[in-house]
């Protein structure tokens, strides 16, 4: 990140989590929250041209001058959300469900306030599949099928939460109940629209977790997310309508969500 900032100016953001597909495919396990907290500190200090204590030594990039790097934390579970509020510059929520987003954003903000931080200084990013389609039952069914893989992917993290906290935790039931029929996950199909083992994910979950439909529906949902405090949306395009979705976002969705600026007032 410091190298990229040196080359192209301060335009990078570090997104970090405990680890999923990259570590599980190599038979590893997600890291601990303690290690995550320490990693955030080390990465942020080095990425901001500052010295940091690491393994008994003081480290710094001698060539780095004036680099600026925010670290955004991806999280789902209560303790990870608490950590995010305590030390993260931003929060990455990998789903677009309005109710879950409201609960998680509030949890992160409360954790920030509890340690004396200003929650308004935290960025909130929602990352989820976006698919532009027609307002017909056939198109709706196709969009849902193309994005069902996402519910399976999120289900990995949800399964970890249920294992750790149980079914009766503070985590919203809308996030945990749907994995009851989950029997496993094949990372060879990770993030693919033709994932063949996500039948347990109901249509309703796909609708809630993703942003689907006409341009007007996308705009309406993104405006609701913005009202909850979301400051950035990162759309996934793992489906069969990439170009059209991108075109409509560029021509219609983004302009509708961007405050107008006049050249002369």
Question: Which residues does each predicted region cover?
Answer:
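Structural motif
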Residues: 7, 86-87, 228-230
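Hydrophobic faces of well-ordered beta-strands that scaffold small-molecule active sites
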Residues: 12-16, 71-75, 91-93, 122-129, ...
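A short acidic, helix-capping loop that chelates divalent metal ions and anchors anionic groups
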Residues: 22-27
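An alpha-helical appendage that flanks or caps ligand/catalytic pockets
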Residues: 29-61, 106-107, 112-227, 258-265
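Short, acidic/polar
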Residues: 75-86, 214-224
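Short, flexible active-site-proximal loops enriched in glycine and acidic residues
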Residues: 7-17, 48-55
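Well-ordered beta-strand positions
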Residues: 45, 89-90
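Active-site-adjacent beta->alpha loops and helix N-cap segments on the catalytic face
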Residues: 97-112, 241-247
